[in-house]
């Protein structure tokens, strides 16, 4: 089984927010069952920016120290998630896909399809209400548990 986590789901997990427990249950089960977990390359870029910003605001004022800590955290992220990619043709497809009102969600959806994921796990299921669910099921973390 292959699971794709959108950016907000991963942020909730890393920041121990409202849905962190449900996501952790999924990740533990995924590890136990040898399921593959994916995030998009765009999510990885966003996480890099947000984690560094968070470190800066939480006492890591020294750039070298902050980057070292950032590298540790990102290495942990990469030990949990594979990276699903999209190519320029996919980007053009998303730009011209009027069924999505949020292009970033379309990129996430396309990355999940490219990785042949069975599930796209999101906190904003309404953002994917027009997505074709023939090949992928779109659910919230609590639905999966």
Regions found by a protein language model. Give the residues of each.
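Acidic, PIN/NYN-like endoribonuclease modules and their adjacent C-terminal/linker elements
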Residues: 2, 29, 110-145
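A generic structural signal for short hydrophobic patches within well-formed alpha-helices
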Residues: 10-11, 44, 128, 144
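Short, flexible helix/strand-to-coil boundary loops that buttress conserved ligand/catalytic motifs
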Residues: 14-15, 51, 98, 132
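Conserved beta-strand segments of alpha/beta enzyme cores
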Residues: 36, 82, 135-137
